[in-house]
Amino acid sequence: MTKYIIITGGVLSSVGKGTVAASIGLLLKNRGYKITMVKVDPYLNVDAGTMNPYMHGEVFVTDDGAETDLDLGHYERFVGINMYSYNNITAGKVYFEVIKNERQGKYLGQTVQIIPHVTDQIKSMIRYASNMANADITIVEIGGTVGDIEGLPFLEAVRQLKLEEEEGNVVFVHVALVEFLKVTEEIKTKPLQHSVQELRRIGIQPDIIVARSVVPLDEETKKKIALFTNVKPEYIFSNYDVNMTYEVPLILEKQGLASKILSKLNLPDNQPNLSEWIRFIDNLKTADKEVKIALVGKYTKLKDSYISIKEAIYHAAAKLHIKPVLVWIESTDIENSKEAIDKLKSVDGIIVLPGFGSRGVEGKILAIKYARENNVPFLGICYGMQLAVVEFARNVLGLEKAHTTEVDPNTPHPVITLLDEQKKVVQIGGTMRLGSQKVIVKEGTLAYRIYGNIEVYERHRHRYEVNPEYVDLLQKGGLVISGVSENGLVEMIELKNHKFFLGLQGHPEYKSRPLAPSPVFIGFLRAAAGV
């Protein structure tokens, strides 16, 4: 029978629930338990696909093509398991199913209400995700903060879940901020106390508290929290500041969090093997050979917009034992500022990041031109690959007004155009070419040397493609088409006689993990570092 760990959050959002949930998953998986994860997002969007990255951060794409919350990326990277569409439950999905059921007469004439119909649907979706994974333990992270009006049905649903499950099958872990005042050097616990009081009003008593803090909690602070939250001090843990999020599982393991959770769930506490994880962190900490990488994009003011790419760089860097220095460059700045262009002169490699729309496009093209002309290792991902084709068409083939029809529908040289299957699509959400797609790699190319296989799979998220009508012209001009889909779509492009120049329509960052880095990022960093 599946056991459940419910993660709630208090005081404020972005308090680290996702990292704590992923860390618990890692620690329990390393003890031999089969784990699955569920992220509950109380927003009314059906998925994260139509959200602005500045509002919500990266959209993480799963193998089955779901456009999900970035926390699912944390889960995959930490726990080392694949997530699917059913691992991300949103209020939009829940209400959509409830209304559909009502229209189909499945409620037999009942008045459809939040309780029981919405809460039953939430529980059903949690249990479905658990059953699909045949999990020993399902970790459910409730997005948002206790007290948010949109989160109330979800908290009520997990309260009911505990009531319905056998004793010892459900554990509540509450993650909340405790503020450290530098002026008085005091830790203030009152906001955490109030968040637990709010949780208890809903009918949920946390079994374990993880306090997010700048510094480790002392015993007196734990006793104070215990007094006001009805949680014993030995079940209060400190998630304090560390140099990198990958250290969080280790500090929680050192405090005994996983062991306490297992005791609450009446499960054996096996000895974990974290040696590979520790080695990965040590490699990052002890690396001293610096390599400067420019990341050129339109959402660089919020680094979470590209979190999987950032993490994929660190995964590959640990493998190569080098120290990456990330130089974030807003692509619009390159269009308007000589200083931004000058930044490119100091880097060892350039990544042109994915994105949509016209803003910052010319800046990205200038960055690609610089990389091509100056033999700087270049990696273009999704839109970055498409714009590399545009740059090549303009500046090598002499098609001065070449463009993507996404930006200029009337371009005389539409080297990038809408996929055939997208031309009749009206709805925006969930309609792109999504998920894991097979790529056939040409032997003797850079891509083949990187992957070492003729057939590879990468996750995709796009509507546009390299225009098939221009493929012959591009190849005659010197562009290498090193990877295609099963039906002939251009998937990978590269240049001969260049240190490293590779563009991919897919997103290799989504499959990169600390202990299994993406070969694309390994190849790129190896070229940038000269190792």
Swiss-Prot record:
It comes from Sulfurisphaera tokodaii (strain DSM 16993 / JCM 10545 / NBRC 100140 / 7) (Sulfolobus tokodaii). Keywords: ATP-binding, Glutamine amidotransferase, Ligase, Magnesium, Metal-binding, Nucleotide-binding, Pyrimidine biosynthesis. One of its GO terms (biological process) is pyrimidine nucleobase biosynthetic process. Disulfide bonds: none annotated. Catalyzes the ATP-dependent amination of UTP to CTP with either L-glutamine or ammonia as the source of nitrogen. Regulates intracellular CTP levels through interactions with the four ribonucleotide triphosphates. CTP binds at S13, D148, I149, E150, K188, T189, K190, P191, L192, Q193, K224. The active site is at C382 (nucleophile), H507, E509. Mg(2+) binds at D71, E141. Residues 1-267 are annotated as: Amidoligase domain. CDD domains: CTPS_N, GATase1_CTP_Synthase. Its EC number is 6.3.4.2. Pfam families: CTP_synth_N, GATase. L-glutamine binds at Y54, G355, Y383, G384, M385, Q386, E406, R463. SUPFAM superfamilies: Class I glutamine amidotransferase-like, P-loop containing nucleoside triphosphate hydrolases. GO terms for molecular function: ATP binding; CTP synthase activity; glutaminase activity; identical protein binding; metal ion binding. It catalyses: UTP + L-glutamine + ATP + H2O = CTP + L-glutamate + ADP + phosphate + 2 H(+); L-glutamine + H2O = L-glutamate + NH4(+); UTP + NH4(+) + ATP = CTP + ADP + phosphate + 2 H(+). Signal peptide: none annotated. This is CTP synthase. The gene is pyrG. InterPro entries: Class_I_gatase-like, CTP_synthase, CTP_synthase_N, GATASE, GATase1_CTP_Synthase, P-loop_NTPase.
